[in-house]
Amino acid sequence: MRIARFSDGTNPVYGALEEGSTRIVGLKGDPLFSPVEPSGQIYELDEVRLLSPVIPRSKVVGIGNNYSDTPIPVDERPEPPIFLKANTSVIGPDDPIAIPAWSNDVVFEGELAIVIKSLAKNVSASDAPQVILGYTVANDVTARDAMTGGPWSRGKSFDTACPLGPWITVDPQLDVTNLAIRSYLNGEKAQDSS
């Protein structure tokens, strides 16, 4: 199932994209915190504005240095840097990114984002699947010159630095260890990784 958050010109709503279709079935409720059910409303994908599929209630937690050209066994990997993105950095997939005037080195990187379905803390690795709602795409926009000699959040947390979406893929059988991530800049492929 693919869950979208969108607006048809009124208040934002959640919906489920019908498989193999451009129709969205409206949902009542918030899939991140409560069970949902069909609202009876049907929307066409090309008639709505897609919003960020997630409204962060707290923060976006990022893990740095998560790509490698050489596979490294999990137990041999160094502790990765952790950084935060403010909830004001989150925007929808088609919203404009406001490049900060104070930076001369802004870059982007496509990322796989894990969507947590409820507030969670101190979750063990074995219990992690129980708190995962699904996955979406994130654009990790970074002002690299603001990170020099300081915390990563300085360069990663400015307003609009975290486009998400277009939807949350909910599939417990999804093998996230074997997904392709491609990013494009002005129609040209800029990233192709997994």
Task: Please describe what each predicted stretch is.
Residues M1-N11, A16-S193:
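Active-site microenvironments in enzyme catalytic cores
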